[in-house]
Amino acid sequence: MVQAPLSPSLLQTQSISQPPQETEALKAWLEELTQKIIEGDRINKSEALTLTQIEGQDSILLLCEAADRIRQACCGNVVDLCSIINIKSGNCSENCRFCSQSVYHPGENSPIYGLKSSEEILAQAKAAEAAGAKRFCLVSQGRGPKYQGAKSKEFEQILATVRQIAAETSIKPCCALGEVTPEQAQALREAGVTRYNHNLEASEGFYPEIVTSHSWRDRVETIKNLKAAGIQACSGGIMGMGETWEDRVDLALALRELGVESVPINLLNPREGTPLGDCHRLDPFEALKAIAIFRLILPQQILRYAGGREAIMGDLQSLGLKSGINAMLIGHYLTTLGQPPEKDLAMVESLGLQGGEAPIPGEYQTRS
């Protein structure tokens, strides 16, 4: 299938204006921009790039306050809680430079195992539900069911497991299996999958720097297949792989144009043995700035704290929830450990927020 191009503006380098430097002037400028967004206007690439020029902790915190106002106005105070399970790990055919599961550069402590049993997956779904998660995502290595054949036994087993989770729990099953055909997307929808994770990972321009075994356009095609089947798209990226601020803005704009509902923000926690294993870790305030800019570009989307938040943010994790974040992945990640769910829930409640299931774009205004 030949993919229609995204807006040409996403691929063009633009000159960058400077934001006001004096504190009160910056406050006034951000207030005007914030009100414009709350009233339903969308910022353009030029305005987003100007936001990237805000420097210094005090000024970044002003940007974070603006993002928090937008989050409150457009999404409310519910923090969406989800959990994941790595149902098949290691020996992945793809060469993603950040990932320790790739057969090209396996991480030293990355587990390798085949597809877990339905019983084991169901047990972990029930544990995630008991811990407070509202969604439970089945994540598998590999390029995807699209390349396993129309009668893949593995895909059929996953569909059966999804049906079992839907029947025996109240947690909502999600999947992240890689690329799918329109027919497979429909089968997932009929089994009970209402949201599917397939991260763009980076901007189209930067993508070849981190993956060459498949294209960015391949990922876009799968997102379109999912949405055509009536499945919500969960798609975001990773910060800290060497991308520029313009790359980050282009990623957010592409996600906006695709109409994704949920946007995971991963902060690279470099894995030893991978090509990005020696990457310099993001400064927490750079991460907060990126989160805030994503919120200004994506005012109604579910913006999710995902991998790397504990390692990168440390004691500043809670600031993310006051900088535009309104969702969290709780529990463990694919190949690294997370903090105890009860600690996450306590952090959410300490900020006057509540764990639950956040509204998708447009739903909060409807509820209100």
From Swiss-Prot:
Homodimer. Binds 1 [4Fe-4S] cluster. The cluster is coordinated with 3 cysteines and an exchangeable S-adenosyl-L-methionine. Binds 1 [2Fe-2S] cluster. The cluster is coordinated with 3 cysteines and 1 arginine. InterPro entries: Aldolase_TIM, BATS_dom, Biotin_synth/BioAB, Biotin_synthase, Elp3/MiaA/NifB-like_rSAM, rSAM. GO terms for molecular function: 2 iron, 2 sulfur cluster binding; 4 iron, 4 sulfur cluster binding; biotin synthase activity; iron ion binding. [2Fe-2S] cluster binds at residues 137, 174, 234, 304. PROSITE patterns: RADICAL_SAM. Residues 74-309 form the Radical SAM core domain. This is Biotin synthase. Belongs to the radical SAM superfamily. Biotin synthase family. One of its GO terms (biological process) is biotin biosynthetic process. It catalyses: (4R,5S)-dethiobiotin + (sulfur carrier)-SH + 2 reduced [2Fe-2S]-[ferredoxin] + 2 S-adenosyl-L-methionine = (sulfur carrier)-H + biotin + 2 5'-deoxyadenosine + 2 L-methionine + 2 oxidized [2Fe-2S]-[ferredoxin]. [4Fe-4S] cluster binds at residues 92, 96, 99. Pfam families: BATS, Radical_SAM. Catalyzes the conversion of dethiobiotin (DTB) to biotin by the insertion of a sulfur atom into dethiobiotin via a radical-based mechanism. Its cofactor is [4Fe-4S] cluster; [2Fe-2S] cluster. NCBIfam families: bioB (TIGR00433). Its EC number is 2.8.1.6. Pathway: Cofactor biosynthesis; biotin biosynthesis; biotin from 7,8-diaminononanoate: step 2/2. The gene is bioB. PANTHER family: BIOTIN SYNTHASE (PTHR22976), BIOTIN SYNTHASE, MITOCHONDRIAL (PTHR22976:SF2). Keywords: 2Fe-2S, 4Fe-4S, Biotin biosynthesis, Iron, Iron-sulfur, Metal-binding, S-adenosyl-L-methionine, Transferase.
